[in-house]
Every structure is written in structure tokens, then in C-alpha cells.
Amino acid sequence: ILSMLLIASPILFVLAVYPDSFSMSWNQGRGGFLFGLAFIVAEIIGIKFIVSRTRLIFGIPLAVATIIYFVLLDFGLHDYIINAAPAFNVQLIYSWEWFWDFLVITIFAISASILMFGKKWIRIVIAGPVFLAGSAIILSLDAFFPYDTLGPLQYFVPHLVQTNVWIINAFELGTATARDNLMFLQGDHGPFALQVFWPSAGVHSVVIYSLVMMAFLLKMNIKQNRKIMYFGLGIIGTIVINLIRIFSLSVFALKVSTNPVEFEEY
């Protein structure tokens, strides 16, 4: 329990001091911290591994140093990070800003896990750090390669768009056509164009899910065929959820409003 509290302490501190920063939007807040914490807690609870007092004591400075980082953000560090963005040709400031938070918490989670559990940390508490690291990687990609500039991830988007267009026309919700990642919608409130990029299409969630599921499945003592089946079903489920998200946005434009402000708020 003490090891779990130690690893969780920086996240709990940030949650207590900056609760408004925990937005569930993937690139506009620290909501991902909670998912990472949930994975860590789920993995540690129930294990029969005794962490020595010495390891716990050595872990305290790591937690304190991480907490200090988040405190310093209010004392000029945040502005320094934002001002440094142009020097690295960063396109999206929000993703750049949150990338550093996720990078720091990832380094802490991995370092603390190694310190607490030694070489066995990969078998004990891998999913949480993998989720946090995956989030940091995706945020960095979004910061440096925004919109459709990252070809491999953007490659899947037109297929999702075409599927969404087919569903709209099949259910006669309006008129929809597509060209690459651009949808042209004609509904009750007039025409509306919706351009979909890989982050908004949920490609990032598929990537992060894949990493986390691989971490979990490697630990599970089940047959290889079952692992492949669970992994595949999870990928399909994640894609379906992202399709539903794109579809709901399209229905809003078709049936509710084409006002850009209202659309953004939705």
C-alpha cells in the first residue's frame, strides 16, 4: 500500500491543487493521469511483493522532485515552456504544454517502479507507465506533426470518413460526400464541411490502447490464441467507439446546428 501511495502521490497532489486541469479531452488537460493511476493501482493491489523500507525512503525524493516540477509551473516554468515552443517549430501549443507534464510523470512512474520493484517492475506495474508514456508520445507527435502532416497515422482517417458517410446516407440523415479526410454534409440547417485529422479521429486512442493491451496480455497466463483474440476485439471496439464519435458530430451538424461556435462547444 505504501509503495502504491508513493507512486500515486504526485498525481494526487496535482489533482488536489489543480483539479480544473483534469479535463478528459486528450490534449487539453491532465485527465490521462487518472487513467494511468487507475492502471497502476489495479496492478499493485493484490500482489504479494514486499517493498523494503529503504526502497520507500529512496523513493520519496523522486516524488518530491516531481511535485516540485508541478509547483514551479506557477512560478514561471509554464511560461518558459510555452515561450520555447517556436524554437522547436512546435505547431500546437496545447499539445506541447501537456506533453511535458506527461513526460515528467512518465519518467517518475518508471523510475519509482524500478526503485520499488527492481527488475520485476515490468511484470508488476507495466500498464500504467506504458499508458502515460504512450500519451506523452502521442502529444509530442501532435505538437510537431499536427493535422494531416503525419502520413502513417493520417492514412486510416479517409477510411473512417468514408464509413461515416455511408452510414449517414444509408439512414437518410442527410446528404454526405467525402474526399480524403473532408466530409461535405447537407442537413436540416444547410451545408457544413467537416475535416477530420488523426487525433480527432481517435487514431491516438487505438495506438495507446494497443500499447496498454500488449502490456496486460504479456502478463496474463492464457493461451496465445486468446491473447490475439482479446487484442483484436479490443482494437475493433476502439475503432467502433471512434466511429460513433465522428458520427455524433456529423449528426449534430446535420440535425442540430451548423453554427461553428455551437459545434465546437458540442
Model segments located where?
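Hydrophobic N-terminal alpha-helices or hydrophobic patches in metabolic proteins across all domains
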Residues: 1-266
